[in-house]
Amino acid sequence: MTDPRIIVAIDTFDLKKANAIVDQLDPKLCKIKIGSVVFNALGKPFLQEIFHRGFKIFLDLKLHDIPNTVHETILGFHDCSIDMLTVHLSGGEEMLKKAMLAAQIIKTQVIGVSILTSLDESDSLNLFNNSLNDQIVNLFKLAKKIKIDGIVCSPLELEVANRILDSHTIRVTPGIRDIL
């Protein structure tokens, strides 16, 4: 069986609604994405329930903290059978290395978030003293250096990603469609 390429986000913290969405899905066809709002509301038991229903889990918490905290946070998911989880590439080389080490232990993939799509050119200049495109290039180069498992990026960044990253690096691009 091939790995599902579609990732469906559960974006409700109402357990009944979340289960109603999951009930409509087939684990052979998609993975389930759980973001921070849903995770904070429903916690590990919901992750474990989704896993036991046969789904691969994409935990989108966008971790960004000191290296040891990110490492320990990832290790804390050892009992959740997570397929992929996100960290911010802007957390830096040491944080990413520690994330990768922890991910190897719990057998998950680390997916690096480049630039949030809510940020624009002005934000990039203010935050990074760099143009948006140059910052994305820098982050993708860091991802390649660290040998991160994958990246999350805007579809508009795929051309740059394809130029910089290895062909085996996973690319996740968001698309939003309500199903309920």
Question: What kind of region is each of these model predictions?
Answer:
Residues 51, 55-58:
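Short, structured active-site "lid" loops
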Residues 1-24:
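N-terminal glycine-rich anion-binding loop in soluble enzyme alpha/beta folds
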Residues 24-34, 80, 143:
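Catalytic domains of carbohydrate-active enzymes, especially glycoside hydrolases
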Residues 46:
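Pyridoxal 5′-phosphate
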Residues 32-42:
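Glycine-rich, proline-tolerant flexible connector loops at the mouths of alpha/beta enzymes
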Residues 2-3, 65, 69-160, 164-180:
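Conserved anion-binding
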